[in-house]
Amino acid sequence: MKSGVTTVVDAGTTGALDIGKFYEDTKKYKTNVYALINIAKQGITSQDELSSMMNIDEYELKRAVKKYKDFVVGIKARMSKSVVISNDVEPLKVAKRIKNELNLPMMVHFGSSPPTIEDIFDYMEKGDILTHIYNGKPNGILRGNEVKKEIIEARERGIILDVGHGTESFSMDIAMKSKDAGIFPDTISTDIYIKNRINGPVYNLSTTMEKFIYMGYSLEDIIDKVTKNAADAISLKNKGLIKEGYDADLTIFDVVNEEKELQDSLNKSVITSTSIKPRAVVVNGEYLNIGKSIGENE
């Protein structure tokens, strides 16, 4: 909230065994918090949470979703070699069946292969979310300098493309090539945690938004991608719009002309002339100052 974000969604840190503790921890904050539950029962206690299929406990997963139905907004499956080891797409097959039984959206993380992005798409459906789309790894959205036809087909099938910046998952060059090809992200997200919040390259949502301004996206389009589109992707019916009947969650910010260095996950740096400075938020109807307005000493 202090960085101008009124609602956050944790993308799979916890699984069925520890999501209850996470839920209780969120109650101490004014920020609205929701979660995608990891299909691995232990969540991300290590980077290879799906190296054993025994880590998927369908009964406990469904029980946790039912118990925390107003908190869990979808399920998360991390599909990269370091996570699944030798299991390839087998965890994703299970995740697809479970998410259909629960009628929840599914977010899929992809990185190094196997599984390949082509194989991953075989188990994704309309309304599912692919994150880290600009990750810069060989198993990415480009084939040479062209966007893979599978990505174009996925968009046509209604699969949601999410940025998921993260420490290692955002290449500005790939993002620009994708934009030039007419393939745009549906949602812009940070994949933020303590390391990339303090040391970069993420820092906060505003900085991620500034990168898309630098790449030529309009501020209005960017705002849609971090508000309305994001809320729609996980069916948060009362979020994402300034409209009667919606929650009174707002961010007040200044857009100022000043030079600032921006860095992607591959150490590419650019200088932008546009900076977003959150000044205040309204969370559940409560107004809170978080910064100084234009004209005041910074």
Regions found by a protein language model. Give the residues of each.
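Divalent-metal coordination cores built from histidine and acidic residues
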Residues: 1-80
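Divalent metal-coordination and catalytic microenvironments
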Residues: 4, 22, 75, 130, ...
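Residues at the N-termini of beta-strands
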Residues: 6-7, 74, 129, 187, ...
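Short acidic, glycine/serine/threonine-rich loops at helix termini
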Residues: 21-22, 45-51, 87-89, 117-121, ...
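Active-site core of metal-dependent hydrolases
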Residues: 77-177, 182-199
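His/Asp/Glu-enriched, well-ordered alpha-helical/loop segment
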Residues: 173-255
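C-terminal cap of metal-dependent C-N hydrolases
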Residues: 247-297
